[in-house]
Amino acid sequence: MSTTDDPTTANPVGLDRAGYDPSFLTVDVPLPALHTLARELPYVHFTVLLDPVRRLAALTAVNIDGSALLDLGRGDDWHLDERVPDGEQTGPEVYASNDLDRGHLVRRRDPVWGEPVVAAAANVDTFSFTNAAPQAAEFNQSRELWLGLEDQVLQYASTHRQRLTVFTAPVLLDDDAPYRGIRLPRRFFKIAAWTTSDGGSLRTAAYLLDQSPELDGVDLEAAFARAHEQGDPPPLGPYRTYQVPVRDVAEMTGFDLAQLAEADTLRPVPTIEPPDGIREGWVPLTSVDQLSF
């Protein structure tokens, strides 16, 4: 893993890092309010609300301009944010010598638009550790589906030359398992927001990625004990992906998402009784063909 804390690389001098723009769409979409203390960190075309206690992002918000996207090389220079004390962000030590991935929250390509120098800076900014969260490295069908969702968001913006705003974050719960000084989130959410073709109405769609272990009782306790003895990350389960009501994301996270919930395109579907672990109204996704805006 290559990391750098060189400010000339991670934070080019003179560049305006205005962060997320609430007026980016034709309908104003303010940064959702959270009822806990969080550091607001502006980057190029996106903002991270960092929970200094959990040392992870409580929320990320990115503006995507589909008419101005640039295709730049990936790079891999993960770096700490020099504006934040090291003890308030999750650095490389959490990802060393294990099977955890540094999962981008704001996807690398999403803020990479505009003038080349600006797009290049946005590309670098996405490799801040404040924009990462630990995820199970196992690549299965549902994780591929989640990445397919991210691809579709960007493809939609590019094809239709559309502007989108996307909110992404881990769901930070008190009972998340401890590991190397942090707690590993089990769920992640993504909310896409856009306006109708006439520009007059807001529309949203929310998705949830769940990597909770599919164990319980004695089996789960034994798995935790083995991981602790061996110094491994706590057990995580296979990824499951759902489209969910925005109001459920608000309930899980504590964010005020009233405006986004009002614009939710997901309509309730009557069910007899949802399976264990799935709330009523959640739609399990098994194919990219099910993803739509």
Task: Label each PLM-derived region with a short phrase.
Residues 1-293:
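Domain-level detector for secreted/extracellular nuclease and nuclease-toxin modules, and
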